[in-house]
């Protein structure tokens, strides 16, 4: 059974799921490593440690789930990013769908009565006072992280599973997606089912991972900044400065 030569489809699947198994395991254990967290905080100030620590994790994910598998698939099978839905093209219909669904997702998070629970996990950079630079780093690193994430799930995995049929491909994709969210709690694991179905459908409908990426990015940033606003131990430095300026202008001594 194991002596038969692998077909190109089988080699593709081995590369993709092997890369995911190794890459996600590496990311997960480093992300949850107390010793690594302590090492960052010993070497840098608290704010700088949080920025560098989270940037390291997200760039690692970008490499192990995006860059490395793409290099292997390209070098061994001659595949390109376009084969997995990473197409650089503009589509007004696609842009409109992304915009509407992003507003819906952000609105759902905004009106969610349980959004206070987000404070325990988001934003992942545990910084007391956020500057514009911190916000920019958060957005850029989340973007790189989720680009690799969606390329792996809705690009590599979905394409590799399509020979077994659309429903099998989508079902397995969602199952793995849910498993990846279990460490974040029951609510996120359950929410991964409809969200996973939606982004799989968008990917198949448009033949591109960009709708899934932009929608996932909107979700991640909404979680981050709504949680930041709800956390009494965190604040935006610009708001504090503007508030202080307002109080000075209203003071009789001004």
Language-model segments: residues:
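Alpha-helical membrane-protein architecture signal
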Residues: 52, 132-144, 154, 168, ...
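Membrane-interface helix/loop boundary segments of multi-pass membrane proteins
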Residues: 116-127, 148-172, 201-208
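Hydrophobic alpha-helical transmembrane segments in multi-pass integral membrane proteins
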Residues: 71-75, 141-146, 151, 203-215
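Core segments of transmembrane alpha-helices
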Residues: 62-68, 144-154, 195
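Juxtamembrane helix-loop-helix connectors linking adjacent transmembrane helices
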Residues: 2, 41-54, 75-145, 159-163, ...
């Amino acid at each position: 059974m194991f002596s038969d030569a692998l077909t190109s489809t089988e080699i593709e699947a081995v590369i993709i799921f092997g890369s995911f198994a190794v890459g996600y395991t590496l990311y997960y254990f480093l992300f949850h490593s107390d010793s690594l967290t302590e090492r960052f905080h010993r070497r840098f100030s608290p704010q700088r440690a949080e920025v560098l620590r989270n940037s390291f994790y997200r760039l690692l994910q970008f490499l192990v789930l995006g860059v490395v598998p793409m290099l292997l698939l390209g070098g061994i099978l001659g595949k390109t990013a376009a084969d997995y839905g990473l197409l650089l093209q503009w589509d007004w219909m696609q842009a409109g769908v992304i915009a509407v669904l992003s507003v819906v997702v952000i609105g759902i998070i905004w009106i969610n009565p349980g959004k206070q629970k987000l404070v325990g996990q988001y934003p992942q950079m545990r910084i007391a006072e956020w500057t514009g630079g911190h916000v920019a780093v958060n957005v850029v690193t989340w973007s790189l992280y989720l680009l690799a994430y969606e390329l792996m799930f809705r690009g590599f995995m979905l394409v590799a599973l399509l020979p077994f049929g659309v429903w099998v491909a989508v079902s397995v994709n969602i199952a793995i997606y849910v498993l990846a969210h279990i460490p974040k709690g029951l609510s996120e694991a359950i929410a991964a089912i409809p969200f996973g179905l939606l982004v799989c459908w968008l990917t198949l409908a448009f033949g591109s991972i960009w709708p899934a990426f932009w929608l996932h990015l909107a979700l991640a940033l909404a979680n981050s900044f709504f949680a930041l606003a709800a956390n009494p131990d965190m604040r935006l430095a610009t708001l504090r400065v503007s508030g202080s300026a307002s109080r000075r202008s209203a003071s009789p001594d001004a």
